[in-house]
């Protein structure tokens, strides 16, 4: 599937559908080939019923711009992006710093199993 993006904007943004016990939400993550895993904000994960304060989740140590942090690992029922769908998909629950143009990242954990083409001349991204 081919999805258009704005090649002048700098970030490759596209729609992604997330499902959890409380419902479905369409988000707009940034494609991040430097991110090992997909990261979603805790607010978004709460919205679809996949994250709750006070519950202990497995964590992973993640290197961020401000150092190494322990990030909860949370399972979403379904993540669909760029025409591909993964069920029972583990993501990182972490709110990115304010001021960024996005609060979610689609990382290598999702795209690694596919062929990825990002064409900045035409403004299309393909995941097959």
Q: Model-found features: residue ranges?
A:
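Pepsin/retropepsin-fold aspartyl endopeptidases
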Residues: 1-128
């Amino acid at each position: 599937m081919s999805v258009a993006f704005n090649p002048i904007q700098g970030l490759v943004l596209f729609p992604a559908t997330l499902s959890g016990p409380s419902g479905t939400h369409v988000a707009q993550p940034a494609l991040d080939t430097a991110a090992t895993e997909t990261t979603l904000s805790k607010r978004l994960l709460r919205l679809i019923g996949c994250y709750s304060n006070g519950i202990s989740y497995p964590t992973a140590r993640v290197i961020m711009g401000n150092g190494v942090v322990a990030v909860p690992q949370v399972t979403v029922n379904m993540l669909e992006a760029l025409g591909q769908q993964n069920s029972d998909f583990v993501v990182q629950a972490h709110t990115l710093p304010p001021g960024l143009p996005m609060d979610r990242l689609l990382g290598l954990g999702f795209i690694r199993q596919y062929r990825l083409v990002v064409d900045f001349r035409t403004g299309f991204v393909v995941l097959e």
